[in-house]
Amino acid sequence: MKTYLAPVNEIEKEWYVVDAENKVLGRLASEIASRLRGKHKPTFSSFIDNGDFIVVTNAEKIALTGKKWDDKTYYRHTGYIGGIKETSAKELLEKHPTDLITKAVRGMLPKNKMGRAQLKKLKVYVGAAHPHAAQQPTVLDI
């Protein structure tokens, strides 16, 4: 008996909306990454993108446990000698509230073309409003 592989044109991608208010960042990000990959579906294959679209609202109200607001640092490099920059989670939330969730989910996805394509299906917004009402997203309680 052969393993069933759904053809790419038959894969139905659903839309989900997640409210991030008072949700712990890592727990929320791991569930989102799993849904973006399609691991919750019985037709999951690691080499086929059959994940769903996820819309995250209230990104500015995400929660971190312990002293992570001050201790957790994000690094980036300018490309120049000695050009490493670091930002705490609190500073990142003030400047770019959506990046906190996006960076957490990106770290949980594959580091290849498919991972980049799956990350494009993640839509993160500040506040409760989002422009994807036409897709009729289902509320996902995590």
Swiss-Prot record:
Q: Which GO terms describe its molecular function?
A: mRNA binding; structural constituent of ribosome
Please provide the Gene Ontology terms (biological process) for this protein.
negative regulation of translation; translation
Kindly state which keywords UniProt assigns to this record, in alphabetical order.
Ribonucleoprotein, Ribosomal protein
* Pfam families tied to this protein: Ribosomal_L13
InterPro entries the record matches? Ribosomal_uL13, Ribosomal_uL13_bac-type, Ribosomal_uL13_CS, Ribosomal_uL13_sf
Q: Which residues span the membrane?
A: none
**One GO cellular component, as annotated:** cytosolic large ribosomal subunit
Which PANTHER family does the record match to this protein? Answer: LARGE RIBOSOMAL SUBUNIT PROTEIN UL13M, RIBOSOMAL PROTEIN L13
Q: How does it assemble?
A: Part of the 50S ribosomal subunit.
Q: Which family does it belong to?
A: Belongs to the universal ribosomal protein uL13 family.
Biological role stated in the UniProt entry: This protein is one of the early assembly proteins of the 50S ribosomal subunit, although it is not seen to bind rRNA by itself. It is important during the early stages of 50S assembly.
Q: What is this protein called?
A: Large ribosomal subunit protein uL13
